Amino acid sequence: MENDEAFDRLIRKIQENQKHPSFEGSNKVLHLALSYLNTNRQNPHWVCDPKLQVAVRECLFLFSFQNDNEYLVWFKKHLNERLQLCPKCIVKYHQSLDDFKSLCLNIFHFDPNTLEIVMEKIYSWDIFRLQEVLKTVPKIDTSSASKPILCAFYEILYSPRILHNKEIFPLFRNRFLESGFLRLSKNLVPGVISLLFSRDDELRRWACSILSDVKTISDNEFKILEGPLLQEIRSLDQKKENENEMQIFLKGLSLLLKHVDHLYFRGLTGKNFNVADFILSGLQSDHTNLCPSFLVCLHSLLYCYGRNFWTPEISPSEVIDKIFNGNAYKRWTEENTSNFSNDQKAENPFEWATSLLKTISIIDEVELINKILINYTMQYKKELEVGFKNVQLLQSLADIFSVLFSEYFMIFPHSDQSLQNKVFELHSTLAIKFDELFRLLNLENEESVEWRLIKKVFEYRLNLDLYILKQFYCHYLDRNRKPPLNIKSVSESFKNFWVYLQNVFREEKFFMVRIVFRACSTVCLIDKLPPKKVDIPFKSDFENALNGFVATFSEMLIQTQCWHLSAQTQLVSNPLTFRGIFSLVFSPILEISTGSISIIKSISLSDSVVDTIGELLRSQFSNTLNSSCYVLLQWLKVRNFGGAKHIVYFNKLIINTIFDSVDGLTSKDATFAKQVEKKESLKNFWESLWKFFTHFFIVLPTWPVHDKDNLVDLMRDTLDFCDMLINIFEEVNGFIFGLSDNDIKIVSANDKGSALAMCIADSLVTVSYWLKLTDSSLLTSVVKVICKMLKICKKLECPISQNVIDIIHRASITSDEQTILTFTEREDLFISLTPYLSEDVLNHSPFNDTNTLETKLQSDDRGLLSKDQTIGIAKKLPESNISTSNHFLLPPKAISASKAINRNAQKSQNLNFLKSKQETTQRIRESAKVPRTSAGNHLSEKLNSDNHIPKALQKLDSADPIRKPSLLHTSKSYSNPDDKNTSTSDEDTSESEEESSNGLFSLAREANSHASKSLPQRRQIQFLDFDSLKTKNVVHPTQLRRNTQQSAQLARLRLNPDVQEFYKVILGWNPLADSFSASNVEMQCVQAKFTYNDSNAYEKVFKPMLFHECWAQVKSAVEEKQYPPIDLILNTRSTVDNFVDIYFTSCSPTEVSFLSDTDICLLSKSQSSGDTNNPKSFQLCKIQSISRKKESLELCLRMNIESIDLQEYAPNIRFTAQKLFNATTSLREFAALKSLRHLPLSQRILDANVTRLPSNFTDDKKQKIMKSYGVNEPQAYAIYASSVNDGFTLIQGPPGTGKTKTILGMIGAVLTSSSQGLQFNVPGQTRKTSKNKILICAPSNAAIDEILLRIKAGVYDHEGIKFFPKVIRVGFGDSISVHAKEFTLEEQMIKQMELTNLKKDQEANNSSDTRKKYDSIIKKRDSLREDLEKFRSTGKNSSILEAQLREITKQKNMLEQSLDDMRERQRSTNRNLDVLKKQIQNQLLQEADIVCATLSASGHELLLNAGLTFRTVIIDEAAQAVELSSIIPLKYGCESCVMVGDPNQLPPTVLSKTSAKFGYSQSLYVRMFKQHNESACLLSIQYRMNPEISRFPSKFFYNSKLLDGPNMSAVTSRPWHEDPQLGIYRFFNVHGTEAFSNSKSLYNVEEASFILLLYERLIQCYLNIDFEGKIGVVTPYRSQVQQLRSQFQRKYGSIIFKHLDIHTVDGFQGQEKDIIIFSCVRSSMSGGIGFLQDLRRLNVALTRAKSSLYIVGNSKPLMQEDIFYSLIEDAKTRGVWRDLSANQFKNSKSISNVSTHLASNNLNLASRDTPIKSPSVGICEEKQEAHKVKKRHNIDSANLSRGTERDEDIPNKRAKNKVSTDQTAADNKVTKPRLDESSSSKQDVLNKIDESEIEQASSKKPGYVEKNKDKGHMKKSKKPKSKLALAAMAHGFAPPKVEHFKRK
């Protein structure tokens, strides 16, 4: 504050003193100034501080005193210190001196002489202090101590007077040069200008360097510095005679002209100095040595003035003449030849010509240009002749050509017709003069001076021809352009200059070849002109030029291929050269494309395009993608068909090579995407591709009409490419914005990914226009692509233009008559567009199923359905009504008034549709949150403003939705132009339209081509009488269409429900937890009910039980570890929807054939990878895909993990995966649960409603059915009921009652019944009557295969005529019986494709021959290369070898092309085969009468996608299937479901105790049976068991309703029945002891030992009978099975199990044996009897035997249970209960006694060859089917994982042994009519089947029972055939003598 007051006082005093000067006032001012400075003596900036500067200026008055006083000494000391520190203070100090001088003169009126004395005193002090600094400061360095001398340097240069002081200058020069060339300040100081003209060379050079770095100095700025220059100008007259001083002046002037604004020099004219006149006059002087300096000055002058140099007084031609004709220039160029300087740093005296050309109009001064080029070229040539290369002259020539070429390329595109002659003249001048110069050059290597100078111009010269060629081609593509006129000169250039360039390739001059490739890349997409019927004037000239280029350049490519491999590799090491060669690969011209790809193949060491692309991406990823971006950019300039075709092909290869899920670079190498350079390259590539798509769909309609088929293929490929890119969007997004080198965890890329999505949104603008296509296949692809694009845009909240929204919306709501879009496609479009639609639009949606919309919109993760997944409801138009030759032709507008009526009608109809739920639409819009303003609008504007865009889009936009062709009448508008039936005039018209059209897609012909055609007279609208239609049972077409649409909606929801929840739940489980549902209320089980209110209630019950069952499978699999672990290494990961897909590689040799997709696996970290005890180290996952390689396995595992846990899954970490179970069945059951509400039988399922049995089963109907199908009465009733009932029909089939035969009868009845209903046929349509199709299912493969084999033998129709329906078996091949394989879909398809496979083999042979030729050519080429190298090294003439090598290379290229074509054809064939395969599969399924599958396999994708409808579904063994499995086959529109089963036999196997507890083990059959058992049809006659065996089951399990077939006692009679201890039916009371095994299952050793004795008794006593496969041992417990097998194996060895079956009860269901031994096991009085109390299990055990049943158990504990009490009491009552110990049984009767007893029997046992006779039981005795034993089959994989309670003996793979015992009983009069010969041999066929099965059977499978021609009888062996019998003999058992068996 005080400081400011002091300054204010100083200022006031100064002002007072200046107004009234006085001595006292001046002293007061000095006192105040000194005081103020003293106060601020700590401030180092006295002078540059504005306030202190005032005080300093006032203190300068101290120098006016005569003597130095103490004040002046103090002031000089402190001022000197500050002037040594601050350059700014120096400047202000000298300005203060000027101010001080002004004050002294003007204010204080000093005497000039006095003032001069004062100023001199100050000057002397300045010289003194600077001298001191220069003398005393040590050597200059970077320390602060050097600052004073640096400030001294600056002050000296700032003041020229000080600089030129005689005392200062020498001292300054020495110290300044000592310090080097210092740069003191950014601003110029006058001393620099002064030194510019100094005679001291070093200081002058320093000044020149300082001035060279300064930007242009303005007029005003330089006036401050002009003093030294003006002084030099004034002394010019003295210097003119001194050449050295003139040289110095001219050099300085030249430099100033380059850096000072021309306005300053114009101002010098007023000072009597005209720079232009001075320089031009100097060129006219006789000073030859000064000529170069004046020319340099002229260059600087022209540079400074630019076009402002020229005035009316000065013209360019005059300047040229003055120079070239001047004596000085002539003498200088003539006398100084070879004396020119080649120092490129020196001023170039020839450079003025370049500056001159930049100041004139090139196009108007071609003659002047010609003069300069001639003069310079001749001068250069003259100097070359004397052996001197004038580098400066060549530099100027290069600069001149560079300027001219640049100007030419700027002028050419904008030149009008008036300038084209001048343009042509300039073109010719440039080409001719450069070619002359080029031939003078000796370009040895890349380092030569000539090449460095001429390199850029050489590239210009190449582009000169290529640019014209490209412009001509672009003119052809766009007729609006004016063609250039000098194409002929280009043709000559290709014949001359370009041919000369071939030497460059021959001599392997890399540096020039690189430029050639780079230049030629600009025409990489130019194509030959297609033939046109209308000739174009310049066409032949263009073709000549193009052919010349192709011929020359293709020869260059051949020459390059002749190089050594190392040379070719070196060539492409340069990125720009690589881009040039790679871009030429895309060329539509075959010769260029083939030659270029051959070079890249060579350096990639591969011979296929695919391998080459892969190698390029591995080694040069960024270069490859950048090169492709360059090609895409080039295509945007030409937009031609040929280029687009190659772009799509090669870029698809690139994308596939990078992102293929199996072989892609990102899949194989997790670190591949970490380089920032790669990320940026891929981002640019992505953007370029979508920009290409945007323009592709614009220009597509403009391409020539003769390429129709090719256009179809190209558009299909392009749409597939779009689809591919959309599918990998997440991978691309992760690549670009995901992991990088420094990242350790994944980065969320959604925000950044929106930039990528915007590219897609921009392309959506043009793709949407193609919704009006008339090619259904392409239209399907367009719809799929658009829907996927919309999905991505919605996910990333990308805005879409309103125009696009309107287009898609109009297409989605267009009626069927106006578009060929199917209902499904329109629905897909509408659903995908929903987030962008308003509330009002959504409320008036034509898709009136609210549940449909809600379901689809909520399942955002679902993929869109493809067209082949939709139901086949789309109306197919007759081929005759649609032009097949023009797939894209958009039909003309319908100029019909009825159109408006239809639209209004449609609108009113839409209003009646159901509205979507408000909360659904609100949620959708909120989730999208997409602003209505669109970034896509700018693209539309840009596209519309492009002059090259055709009007096709405008016509597309204006055209109304396309109507379907009328089916009522044939219209010429839609007829095929190539149709032979059309008239000649129509052909002419079509032809002319083709000629005049811009392309295949043009709409230009709409208005004109049909304007003259008269419209057919329209019929008046007539209203139908709906009442009359109802009475006639006719459906109105509108209602029919509406019904069809609704059916389609329901079908889609039935077949493809959203199942993401299934995997979300399962994959979210912790496999180490005890339970998964403890905290989840939704997963708490509730008791199953008999009926349900709705599907939601049903789902709440069954969904938790289903997941509990899955959880039980998980826990069981984790404990058992059935499958070996697989070691994996993590590669990479990606996010898909709400899951994470992680890709692994396994190099483990572990066999992995057991893996398949949908497997649930346990993934854990390897021991070496971290803490395996961490729960997060274990995760459930699903196999998404599997790729098996020769040495490794590649897996994609899908997981449901939190993003925070992703860091646990980093690349290269080792994991272990172990398969737990296959989730296919559970997944299909979940899908069935989700689709229940949409099933036709949904309500019947919820209500457990069973259709009542028909009451009109008259005797006539009964007798007819029994006669036609050969069945008994209850079977006939069941057949009749199933054929007339809708809904559910229950057939109860107890054991042996002929269920299979009944099913065959149902099949015949359903397939041969005829529909009597009337249908309304739409006029013009032929409605095909859909034939009845049957879907037959069962829980197990064995049951299905049994039915299938019976169908194979034939089925009877309702007239009793045998026929053979078409049958298809669907399912997993390994689980299907060998004898049913021929019916599988795969086998049927293979037969259909055999012919195609032969063609493929032929193609493979051709490829092999070509490969051999190619290998031979390669060897020859390599040999020639070696010989050529030797010749060249020895200097021999190698022209012959070079010619041979070129020819060999051409052959190699042709063979390579052939191999690539073959590979492409092979790939195309494979693609076509895949399509054909799907078509054949679909056709086979469509044509099949019967489809057989397990319940799980009925949900196979093949059936889901085939669009089939099965009105009738038959489920066998329905009581053994869980309820959800029974629902799976009902999703195909089933209206009648026949369930065949037995509720008294085993229930479904369920692993989860919780699920079983709440009723999950109750089948749908049983639930319905319990509700309506009176409606079940009972098959009451059994043909399996001996009456003694069936008596108890019939009484206790079937209320005595199960009757025996006729003569069953005789049929099942056997020799051992006479043995008193054996007999037919026995209960052996064995007092054994039960025990627990390690697995908590029970076993009984005593019972096992007794059964062994019982078996020995049988085989010892009856050695003449082959018991192989006849005996089965059944027990409820698995440990007892192991105990039995152990004892039998110890006794007989492993061979025993080929003759004897030992299984659990569950494993024996469905099988039958002659003898069954049942081990009860339970012997404890306190523990109960466990599983034995299950009536169904006991029923199964007791009903497996045909002839004998032996029960082994402990009676006392068993009788605690009511059922066993009844069983044992019944046995005792019947006298079949035996209380025997093992010893008692062993010794009960000797073998001889038994033999004697048998010998006395009346049985006919005369010889061993005589069979045991028993009467046959059947409808017809002579045709009776025999008893046979089928080997068991593995059940369907779907049921492998099911089980029951923990200690029950349930096998993982339930064995099924279905037996063909469906024999029926009927009256002897009833016979099977019209039996063919094949029927008589049916048993023989089955016998052969059994034999072949035995040959392939394992040791555990049952044997085969040989049968003779007399069906039903066992055959005696000629000798003891049983190996078991032989084994018994070896242990001391002797067979009875033959005499015992002879009849007495």
Swiss-Prot record:
Q: Where in the cell is it found?
A: Nucleus
What does the record give as EC number?
A: 3.6.4.-
Natural source organism: Schizosaccharomyces pombe (strain 972 / ATCC 24843) (Fission yeast)
Compositional bias (Basic and acidic residues) at which positions?
Answer: 916-929, 939-949, 1843-1852, 1869-1891
Q: Tell me one GO biological process term.
A: termination of RNA polymerase II transcription
Q: What is this protein called?
A: Uncharacterized ATP-dependent helicase C29A10.10c
Any one GO CC term of the record: chromatin
Which of the seven top EC classes does this enzyme belong to? Answer: hydrolase
GO molecular function, a single term = transcription termination site sequence-specific DNA binding
| Region Disordered: start-end pairs | 908-999, 1824-1944
Main location class = nucleus
Bias category Acidic residues: which stretches? Answer: 985-996
Tell me its family.
Answer: Belongs to the DNA2/NAM7 helicase family.
Record-listed ATP binding positions: G1293, P1294, P1295, G1296, T1297, G1298, K1299, T1300
List the keywords (alphabetical). ATP-binding, Helicase, Hydrolase, Nucleotide-binding, Nucleus
